[in-house]
Amino acid sequence: MHSVHDRSDRGGALAFLGAEAAPEQASRVGHAAYVTIHGHFYQPPRENPYLDDIEPQPGAAPYENWNERILAECYRPNAFARILDERGQVVQIVNNYEYLSFNLGPTLMSWLERHDVEVYRRILAADRNSARRLDGHGNAIAQPYNHVILPLANERDRHTQIRWGIADFVKRFQRRPEGMWLPEAAIDLPTVAALVEEGIQFAILAPSQAQRCRPMGSNDSEWHEVSNSQIDPTQPYRCFLPADDPSQPQRYLDIFFYDGPVSRDMGFNDVVDSSHQLVGRLAQCLQDRGDRPQLIHCATDGETFGHHKRDKERTLAFAFAYGLPQAGLSITNYGHYLSQHPPTWEVQLKPVTAWSCAHGVGRWERDCGCASESGLHQKWRQPLRQALNWLRDRLGEVYESKVSTYLRDPWAARDAYIDVILDRTPKQIDRFLQAHRSRELRANEVVDVLRLLEMQRNSQLMFTSCGWFFEELSRPEGVQILRYAARAIELAGDAASIDLETEFLERLQQAPSNCEEYGDGAEIYRQRVLSAIVSPRRIAAHYAIKSLFSSFSREAQIYSYTVEQLDADVPHRATIGGDTLALGRLLVKSSITQESHDLIYGVLHLGGWDFHCCIQPFPGQRRYEDIQARLFGCLDHRAQAAIALQSEFGREYYTLDSLISRDRHEIMRMLTHSTLGHLNRLYRKIYQDNYRVLLAFRRDDLPVPIELQAAASMTLNQRLALLMESLERNPERGHMLQQLQQVVTEAEELGCSLQLEEATASLNRLLRQQLWHILHARELAATAQPLLQLDCYLNVVEILRAPIDVDRAQEMYLACLSQHAVAATQTGASVPLSGLLALGNRLHINVNTCLERWVQQVS
C-alpha cells in the first residue's frame, strides 16, 4: 500500500505532498527530460463461442471468472487509484490511465463495456483528457484484434487483425490510433509493411529486437551493431522498408525500444514498491547528453499494477501526481513525443523476434524450451499449429467459394465485418449487407452469409497466442482456442455441408499431451471441447427447465439467443402431487447468425433433482395439440408420464445438468431451499433447548459437542440472514441494530463464526443506494434522510465488522462531496454539509484535504 506512511514528514497530507525531494540525478537534467510508462492491458477472449459469455471459472474464486477477478484487482483500481495520508485516509483519487501510455485489447474492452461501464468510460475519458493535455495525442494505442502472433499469420489474416484492431479502436476512442502494440511484441518485415500500409505510425519493441542502428543519412559503413540489447532507448528510431520504387519516398515505421532493465525491474523486482523507488529508478536512466531531449520509458503488463503486485496502482498514482513532476520529468506519451522529437536515427530489426521468447517466435510454433520450467514438454505446439493452419486454409476455401455467391468481395467483406462484431443490431447487419451484397438476399441466404463470416471470426480467434504460451495443451487457454476451432468447423458444416472435424481430429492426434488422461489433442477435444457445445435445442431445454422456477417475458434473451414464446397464451403446465409437466412452443433465434428454430418442449419434473426435458421441431398445430392431450392425460401416473414423454419426443432428453452452469447453480439453490428451511427449524429448536448447556461448556473451557456447536452456528447465521433481509426491505428499522449486536455477542460467547458474505453484499447495495440519492439530490436539504440511513448502515458494518467494498463507497462519496461542497459554502447550509463531512470521515477520507485541493483548483 502506498501512502504517506512511507515518509518521515507528518505535517499532514498537503504538507507531505509537496515535501518529497526530487532524486539527485534528475536535478541535473533540464526541461528536455520526459518519461512514459506503457501498460499492456490484455485478457484473452474467454467466452464460450456458442454463448458469447464467460462461464464460471472456479480457479478465479471468489470471483466468477478471471476477467471479473482482474477487473477488481487491476482495471478498476487503476481507474480509481488512491493516494493516502499518514492515517491511511484517502486524499486523492487518480485515474492512472490519464498518465499511462496504454493499450487494452479489443476483446477485453468489449467485455469491460458490457460488465463495468463505469471503468470503461473512465478509460475512454482518460484518453480524451490526455489528448487535451498533450496537443491531441491520446495515451491509448491500438492492438491487433485478438492477440495473434502476426509473423505466424498469413498475409490476409495479418491485415485483418490490424484492420479489426484499428476499427475497434476508432469506434471506442473516436480517433485513429497513432501506434499499435504488437502481441508479444512479435515482429518481422512483413508485419512492419502491414502496419505501414494500414497507417500505423509507431510500435514499441524490446531492445533485444534491434539488430543495428545509425544516424539517418549516414553511409553503410556507419552501422552500429546493437544485437545484444545495447541500443539507446532514450530516443525513437525509424525502420525503413525496402524501396519498391527508388524514385518514391521510402516508407517507414517508427520504433520505440523500451528500457529493458527498468521494465524487468517493474515486473519482477521491488522498484514499484514505492513511488520514491520508482521515480529514482527512472531518473537513473537519464544521460548527460547536453540539450538533446531524452525519453525514459518502460513497458510491462498492465496487470502488474494491482493484480500481479497488489496495490501498486497507488505507486503509479503518487508518481504521476507528485513524484515525477517534482523530479523534473515531464509525463508524456509516444505519439506526443514523436510529434515533438522525430527520429534522427534509423534501425534495422532482427528477422523474426518477440519480447517473451529467445527463439524468435518459437514459443508459438514449436517445442523451443520456453515455459519448460515445470519439466513438461511442449511437443504439442508444432502439431497444434499445423492442424490449425490446415483448418484455416480449408475454412478459407469454404468461405471464398460459398460467400462469393452472395457478396461482391469476400475478403473486403470480412475486413468490414468488424462493424457487425461491434454492433450486432439488425439495423447494423442490414447496413453491412447493403454495402457488400451482390444481389438481393433471401432470409436463409442472410443466415448463410452470417454463418460464413462467423466461421471466419472464429478462425481468427483460434490463433489467440495464449493457446501456445504455457506448458500444456489441456490448460484453459489451449482448450479455448480448440473451442473456437470447433465452432468454426460447425459453422462450415451448417453453411456448406462439409465435414472438417474428422481430419482435424486426425491431425490433433499428433499433438501429445503431458497428461495421461488425455494422451493427445484429439482426446482433449473430445473431452473438453465437445462438452462445451451448446445447440439451439439445449438453449430450448435450458429455457424449459428454468421456466419451472422463473417467469420469462414473451421474448427473453438467453445468452446469445433470443427465445420467443409462441404459444397463444402461456405454456401449458399442470402439477399433480409433487410432479410437474410443462409443454411449450419456442422460437429460438441466434443473435449472431440470425438462424432460427421453431421448437416444442416437454419437461417433466418428478421432484428434487429429477428432470426430463425433451425437444423436437414444431410438428404442426394439430400434432402439437395431440401431444399435449396425451401427455397431460397420463400425468397422474409418473412412470407412464415419463414413458409417454419419450414416446412422443424420442429417447434423447435433457436433465438439470444440461443447463448452463450459472443458471444450474441458481436452480440447485432453489431446490435445496425447502430442505434447508426444515433443517433451520430443527437446529433452532436444538439451540434454544441447549443454550445454557452450551454456555456451561464454554464457561468451563470444555470442548463443545460438535452437534450443539453446529446447531448454534446454523441458528445464529440464520438469524443474521433474516435480520439483514428485513433491514433491506425496510431501511427505517434502525432498532435492528440492537438485535444484530445480540447476534454478534452470542456468536462471540459461543465461539461461532458468522458467515458475512450475504450480509456484506446487502450492505454494499444499501450504501450505494443512499449515496446515489445524495449524488442526485438537487439541494443539500434533500441529503439529510440518506445521510441518516448511511449512518445506520455504517453502524451495522461496525457491529458485524463486515468487509464492505469501501472503495466503491469512497468513489461515490467523493463525487457527492465535490458536487455539494461549493453549493453548501455559498448558501451557508452548514448542517447538511457537516453531515456529509462526518460521513467522509467514517469512510476513511481526508475530507479537509480534498476540499482544500478542490478550492485551489476552482480559484
Predicted feature residues:
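Active-site and substrate-binding clefts of carbohydrate-active enzymes
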Residues: G12-D85, P106-T107, W223-D265, N269-F549, ...
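Short, well-structured secondary-structure segments
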Residues: Y34-G39, Q43-R156, T160-Q161, Q174, ...
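Extended, Lys/Arg-enriched charged tracts that mediate electrostatic binding to polyanionic substrates
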Residues: N78-A79, V94-N95, L104, L112-D116, ...
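Acidic, His- and aromatic-enriched active-site or binding-groove loops in soluble protein domains
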Residues: R121-N139, R163, R175, V196-D245, ...
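CE4/NodB-like, metal-dependent polysaccharide N-deacetylase domain
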Residues: R158-L182, D245-Q248, A283-H297
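Beta-rich nucleic-acid/ligand-interaction surfaces
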Residues: E184-T191, A210-R214, S339-P342
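Extended alpha-helical scaffold segments
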Residues: R698-S859
